[in-house]
Amino acid sequence: RVTGLSTAPGNGYATLGSGTRAVAPALIAGAAFGQLELLEAGTAAEAFARRSGRPLAGAIGQVNTNALRDNNSSSSFGGELGALGDRLAEGGVSRGVVGNADWALRFVGTTDLPRREAALALMDQHGEVPCGVVDQSLLVKDADYAFGLRLDHDRVISAFSHCWRGRSVVLVEASDLRRADDYRAFVSSERSDVIEKQALENADSLVGQLLDSVDLERDAVVVVAPSSRSGRVAHLNLFAVHAPRMGTGLLRSSVTRQNSFVSIVDVAPTVAALAGTPQDEGEVEGRPVTISRRGGTPEGRLETLVDANTDAVFRDRVLFPF
């Protein structure tokens, strides 16, 4: 959670990239583009240079970085956008982002804004990500999916493989899940359940394909839900880590000081530590996670988390009924 019970994608991804709570208003949070995408009266690279005063050297540029920085300067949290990206770059770790949660193949009006907030998680302070793809080349038309669009897994895997070289951190967004959740506002609950189930199965398939490119004896894999589901009731989100020599059990951090509970601000310090480039504890709100309860069965740990979520939802409904 960042500003309230529910976390919007912009706030969530901005916080993932900061290690401290950060904000990114929806109207400007998703404006990440590849260099040659069309924007304003030219390319995104030209718009980036015009708005920032510096050329776009990376594959991806967030053209609203200055406005986002102003929003955080005036917030009460003190989040530094791009802190994780800067730390990884300083440590010689390359970065990549792959994903596109757009609703439409062209932007008309405020409902069809670009939804590429994922770039906020690994961009540097200037709004650049050196590798990756966030444009609509990742999408194919599919009438059975939310908004008639879904990710092309072959293109996602290709973009991931291009960035997954040497020491690197690559974020891949299961964007079909994001679109399916956004689509809840336009369909019945029954249709929403069908569409979400299909998106979840598709995301599971994508994760399986990505894991084929990963050496689990050498590489770390982090799974995180950066934002809340749409709707009034907020649920706890998932954060899971598989890393060499980490062992199995439930996570905790010195922020929450509770077994099986961590905070969204703990994600950036955890990723930085796993990459061998730890963030300065004096500069971020979060802390790297540790294993709190070892042993047990996967089924038992899952039951613990399900019960914790049920309790959290009940507590929120009692404390915040409206």
Labelled PLM ranges:
Residues 1-314:
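Soluble extramembrane regions of membrane proteins in the secretory/endomembrane system
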Residues 317-322:
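Selective detector of the "anchor" transmembrane alpha-helix that sits immediately C-terminal
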